[in-house]
Design a protein with these regions (language model features):
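Active-site capping/gating segments
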Residues: 25-57
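Conserved Class I S-adenosyl-L-methionine
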Residues: 44-108
């Protein structure tokens, strides 16, 4: 079985390869930490065996800042209030980069 987790640090927004903003991932991390703890408990109990771990970047592409602000607004993540107008005004494609961990688990 595969377990995909979002991991720290906070996701960041890139414009033409340069970081222009960070997204507060803490609300999502709190939820993800609870899910991770549940899986870790099953590993500790011997019900699951962790066979492989891969930490990697995931990139999500947006057509412009308004598209990104709308998507973040509908998620557990948040932009700091002071950066929303500047990000929403960007009329070029943006990329959000975040760290994820993929684990291969086996039922014992």
């Amino acid at each position: 079985m595969l377990d995909l987790q979002v991991i720290r640090p906070d996701p960041f927004v890139e414009l033409d390869g340069e970081v222009v903003a960070r997204i507060d991932g803490e609300p999502l991390f709190a939820w993800a930490d609870a899910a991770t703890a549940a899986v870790e408990a099953r590993i500790a109990a011997g019900d699951l065996v962790e066979e492989a771990v891969d930490d990697h970047d995931v990139r999500k592409h947006y057509s412009d800042g308004a598209d990104l602000v709308e998507d973040v607004g509908a998620s557990k993540r948040r932009f700091p209030e002071e950066v929303i107008p500047a990000v929403a005004a960007i009329m070029k494609p943006l990329v959000v980069r975040e760290r994820c961990r993929l684990r291969r688990l086996r039922v014992r």
